[in-house]
Amino acid sequence: LDEDGVDAFIIADYGLISMLSGKLKNAEIHASTLLGVYNIETVRILKSYGVKRIIFYANLYLDEMIRIINTFPELDYELVAEGGTCFNDIRQCRLPHIISENEHILTCRSGCVLFDQEDTPQKGKMIAEHPCRVAEVVGIYMAAGIRSFKIEGRTVPAKERVSHIRDLKNYIEQFSNG
């Protein structure tokens, strides 16, 4: 694939990164979110293997990303901006997914009905507020040094995915044009 013009490999395995280190002629190695890049030492190791881009997962706080970017400004940084995340995992859920034996929340943004001890339905309420979309604050991430944004689409209907892409593109252009 390297000889066929592939420009980058997004890799989620340290062993494979180590094996490819220094062997690619054209393609770059990009560190997948699945590697769990959460601190400066991890980035230091990945850089020593020749990784050129770090793809941040949205569960890092902005100040954590900035610390890494400021330590290694020569690397490229990317953020998963939409989709592919569990809001419980990125610190936006207010309750666990399973409330009781009788109640299971399919998504964190779903409404639910709570039951009292006699299994009588109580007032329904939202478990979590709709989270802020990265598109709405993309300028903050761009100012921090993140220049690329991914939109995961496997779990989002096409119609919704298209609107996410359009929104993200518009916000990036607004920030870029001042």
Which stretches of residues belong to each language-model region?
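Residues lining hydrophobic/aromatic ligand-binding pockets adjacent to catalytic sites
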Residues: 51
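Active-site pocket-lining/capping segments in soluble small-molecule metabolic enzymes
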Residues: 1-37, 55-56, 62-150, 154-178
